[in-house]
Amino acid sequence: MSSAINFQIKRTYVQAKRGELVMGEPDIKLARIDNRLIHGQVATQWNGTLGTNLILVANDEVAGNKMRQGLMDMAAPSGVATRYFTLQKTIEVIHKASASQHIFLVAENPEDVLTLVKGGVPIKKVNIGNMHMAEGKRQVATSVAVDDKDVAAFRELQELGVTLEIRRVPTTPVEDISKLFE
């Protein structure tokens, strides 16, 4: 057993002995990359399919922009909570999530997701939804345009064991991710 795992087991045991709350892994149903963050597709189709009760937007700019948060709150389904955290705050608090929180995590780009994963956020699967065309990007799927920086982040996510899929909405087929690396 690795020393890191041994340390974690010992730390958890000590916390339990002290009567401290030991948090489990957060229930992140899916992480999605979407330039638009929360909008109609995310709020209705994805959230409905996933059965989540919390949409967590991990984005440094939006975390401090009450106007954008308000607009996204209008798109969120009733009964579904929204949270807007910086990447660092997401890393710091995600393991404090209640077992009753079923989380749909939304980030703006693959670099942000990579930051979260490297920071210890247990993201197992990333849905690549909307990455709009911009200068220096190339279209690789219906709604996905990437540049070299995006491709490097996707490669590293794969190397870290994160599953990637390209799919706009839950009712459409998954597109071939090899397109990302061409």
Tell me the role of every PLM-derived stretch.
Residues 3-22:
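Short, Lys/Arg-enriched N-terminal segments with co-localized hydrophobic residues
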Residues 19-20, 24-76, 81:
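Long, hydrophobic N-terminal alpha-helical segment
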Residues 27-31, 53-56, 81-83, 102-105, ...:
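Structural motif
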Residues 34-39, 86, 146-147:
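A general structural motif
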Residues 59-62, 87-90, 110, 129-133, ...:
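Short, ordered loop/turn segments at secondary-structure junctions
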Residues 65, 71-75, 79-83, 93-106, ...:
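Short basic, glycine-rich beta-strand/loop surfaces that mediate nucleic-acid
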Residues 84-129:
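Ordered, amphipathic secondary-structure segments that act as subunit-interaction surfaces
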Residues 119, 124-182:
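Glycine-rich, aromatic-bearing surface loops/beta-hairpins
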